[in-house]
Amino acid sequence: MDVSSLAAAAPSLVAPPLHHKPHLAFPPHHPSPARGSIGVRCAHSPSPHPLRPSAATADEEVSLPPSLRVSRLAEEFRVSPDAADRARRLLARAAALPRLGEADRVAANRVMGCVAQVWLVGRCDGAGRMRFAADSDSELSRGYCACLVSALDGARPEEVLDVDPADLAPLGGAAAGTGARSRASTWHNVLIGMQKRARAAIAAREGRPAGEPFPSLIIGRDGAIRAQGTYAEAQAMFLSPNESKTSELVKSLREKKIGIVAHFYMDPEVQGILTASKKHWPHIHISDSLVMADSAVKMAEAGCEYITVLGVDFMSENVRAILDQAGYSKVGVYRMSSDQIGCSLADAASSSAYTHFLKEASRSPPSLHVIYINTSLETKAHAHELVPTITCTSSNVVATILQAFAQIPGLNVWYGPDSYMGANIADLFQRMAVMSDEEIAEVHPSHNKKSINALLPRLHYYQDGNCIVHDMFGHEVVDKIKEQYCDAFLTAHFEVPGEMFSLSMEAKTRGMGVVGSTQNILDFIKNHLMEALDRNIDDHLQFVLGTESGMITSIVAAVRELFDSYKTSQQSANIEVEIVFPVSSDAVSNTSVNGSHHLDSSTVTDLDNVSVVPGVSSGEGCSIHGGCASCPYMKMNSLRSLLKVCHQLPDRDNRLVAYQASRFNAKTPLGKLVAEVGCEPILHMRHFQATKRLPDKLVHHVIHGKGEPTS
């Protein structure tokens, strides 16, 4: 289970709005013609398409303050006796709502995230008040639009921003029948669109420029790519890989029986080559860290004699250990650098501070240590000897912890090392504590309001560890997203800071966001694209990518594949997918004359035509000012290194010794092999994934300490 199920179970949970802060400036580029910045004009700049006040807003209602109008609207639907009555009220309001003209029923005015087509237009009139008009091709959705227009047409921009979505929660249950939950989010998405236009009106009134959009890539129905902004251009360069390099790699892989497992966060050049090569050699797999080792085992079973790992060192260590456990000790495992390929998160778990955290856990029985899989095998082994340990991923951590609390009475759970993920888990459980028992049961059937409140003081998380990539999604980036992209689909890795997490969780409550693993993010994008393709109506889907930019290659490949699979004899709608990179101008660097910013020399010529490349001047890949460029450690896995390793295999002259993945012959403080003890928490996780229960051996270890459970 990923955390997206929480939002589905609790549509009434809405994070409080963040306070506005100054936005960041970005290098100029041309905005998307489909969804550019909204032009909102006040008295000094009349609109070429003035909106007349809605006929649905009666004179006596207009005189009321917007807050009272909102309260009356909410009360009307709160006291409505049943869903059928509420639907009748919506249809009656829809009948009174004026239709928009064809000139306003265009892609730029579409409200994303609605089952039906919904259009919203807004402007600031001469009196400094917002004038709204809306329309839909669905009568129920038109009813929701009419509700919002009647409540907020004529309000001052600040009054529109003051509306709390929680105040309109009674509208959420107004629709009945199939797709009711999705259609009921229409009012929420329309409100977000109104508030976006109100912010733009305030900025125009104060003389503040709209600000440059984030860089983005737009994937057309024909698979063509349009890059907007120099950062996006740098990302797009390698999405159409060099055919000669692809052929060279495939030839070597096939002749020498080499398999490749790579993480999503690889360099775009490498991912582009791998994606193209996979069409000719099946033993290439790009994924998150969870399934890299499993994929390597399948490749060994299929006859691969070598596995090359494109990731950080703990990933190659895990591949080596799991292959040994599976009986493939003769299969060679190779890294992509003779130097250490580190990870800030893994380093945090090997610190003395983390050891102190575990010792504290060992003094608080019964305790279970839930450790993020993105840590070294040695760390897992040493931790498991101090406290019974199970690994987790960003997609199963919530289910793992909830099951542990349900299965072991009085348990203390100690999560680490990612501090942001730990804080986000605690935030999730606090949200669950105010849900109904029925809503909680949808998340985990063994829990209710009482059990969630009881476990909160027994959840502990390490507070001094984080991924340098996800650390960069700070408040400045969040403010810009809120200002310009609040109506877009928001995606966020579970490791992002709390502000980005809260913003994405709010979007999840209205079907517009996902918080989870890299695979969860990819699936979210694919699912929304499939829905658009099934509707076969012109559309522009805009996704803010709240994780490492290296995912773009896999996203583009998946989008292109879906576009190809939906080609039919009937006329295809013009559907586009836009991926927005929420990076600051400090998260890119000017190209230099004497350096290629740690890129291979083979790529320097290609970069001559690009003015910036991902990565700040220090070469770390991310900026402390907010926004992520890329993981510097992952970018050590270059195409040149991959080709070098492949060409030199088999390594008869021992020139690749420094590239071999570590095989742990070292022993733990209790005298056991690191590889053996370090693999056990991973095997516990696999058991949980297969059965949805913690293994008896682990439960016995937690409750009784040493020894095996009796059958």
Swiss-Prot record:
Main localization of the protein described in the UniProt heading: plastid
Cofactor: record remark: Binds 1 [4Fe-4S] cluster per subunit.
Keyword flag Nucleotide-binding: no
Gene Ontology BP terms: 'de novo' NAD biosynthetic process from L-aspartate
GO CC terms, sorted: chloroplast
Cell compartment(s), UniProt: Plastid, Chloroplast
Region Disordered: start-end pairs: 17-63
Positions contributing to iminosuccinate binding: H263, S289, Y372, I373, N374, S394, H493, F494, E495, T518
GO MF, one example: metal ion binding
Protein family according to the UniProt entry: Belongs to the quinolinate synthase family. Type 1 subfamily.
Reported function: Catalyzes the condensation of iminoaspartate with dihydroxyacetone phosphate to form quinolinate.
Protein name, as recorded: Quinolinate synthase, chloroplastic
Organism: Oryza sativa subsp. japonica
Gene designation: QS
